[in-house]
C-alpha cells in the first residue's frame, strides 16, 4: 500500500503554551498495515529506549501504547526541550538501531488545562479493543507506563 503524503506539521511549541504541558503524540510506521511494533522483544527494546531518554531528561513519557503499525503516547517535554528535535532523534534511533522505519512526520496535540489526561488515556487504551486485537483493554501487553502514573 503506498504511503500517503501528509501535510507537514509545525511542531514548535508556541511561546504562550504552558511549559509543563502534556502532548498527545501519534507516530506511524512505514509501511502501514504490518505488525512492526507488537512483538515482545521489539516492545521491550522500544520501552528501554523510552526509559533511556527519560534518564537523560529529554522527556517524561506518562504512557505509551504500541499498536502493530503505530504508537500513541502522552509525553511531557522539559521547558528547554525542542519537541521536534527530541522526537526526531528518538525516531532516528529506532530506525538506525532497531530497524524500525517510521513516517517522517508525526502528529502532536497539546492537551489544554481543561482536557483530562485520564480521558485521553482511556480513549487511547481502547484502540486495541476497537481494532479487534483484544476483548479487554487491560489484556493488551504493549503498554509502557511511567512509574508514578496511574
Predicted regions and their residues:
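Short catalytic/metal-binding and nucleic-acid-binding patches
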Residues: 1-150
Amino acid at each position: 500500500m503506498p504511503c500517503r503524503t501528509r501535510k507537514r506539521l509545525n511542531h514548535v511549541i508556541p511561546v504562550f503554551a504552558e511549559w509543563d504541558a502534556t502532548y498527545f503524540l501519534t507516530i506511524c510506521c512505514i509501511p502501514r498495515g504490518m505488525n512492526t511494533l507488537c512483538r515482545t522483544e521489539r516492545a521491550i527494546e522500544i520501552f528501554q529506549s523510552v526509559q533511556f531518554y527519560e534518564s537523560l531528561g529529554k522527556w517524561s513519557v506518562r504512557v505509551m501504547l504500541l499498536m502493530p503499525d503505530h504508537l500513541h503516547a502522552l509525553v511531557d517535554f522539559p521547558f528547554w526541550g525542542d519537541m521536534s528535535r527530541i522526537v526526531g532523534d528518538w525516531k532516528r534511533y529506532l530506525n538506525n538501531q532497531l530497524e524500525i522505519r517510521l513516517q517522517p512526520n508525526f502528529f502532536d496535540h497539546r492537551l489544554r488545562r481543561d482536557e483530562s489526561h485520564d480521558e485521553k488515556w482511556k480513549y487511547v487504551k481502547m484502540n486495541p479493543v476497537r481494532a479487534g486485537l483484544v476483548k479487554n483493554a487491560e489484556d493488551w501487553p504493549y503498554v509502557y507506563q511511567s512509574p508514578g502514573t496511574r
